[in-house]
Amino acid sequence: MIRVVLPAHLRALARVRGEVELEVAGPATQRAVLDALEARYPMLRGTIREHVTQQRRPFLRFFACEEDLSHEPPDAPLPDAVASGAEPLLIIGAIAGG
């Protein structure tokens, strides 16, 4: 079971509270987790990744085990602590202002 923490605006869109728990078939990668997340919550399609390119949207970052995974390849394995469910994958929305 993989745990995912979404930013507040995406939790509201998906109508979830707190962490999301997902079953991921195969290796635990960013792509596999996001595929499972979008399959379970279709309203999130296009909000985390671009529809066509499947690249991370510019103002979102991925963190796990105190590491920024935002620039890791989408098929790179996630840390073991995330794959085992001990630690969550954090999807963080940027805060900007002027």
What name fits each language-model region?
Residues 1-97:
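Ubiquitin-like/PB1-type beta-grasp interaction modules and other compact soluble beta-rich domains
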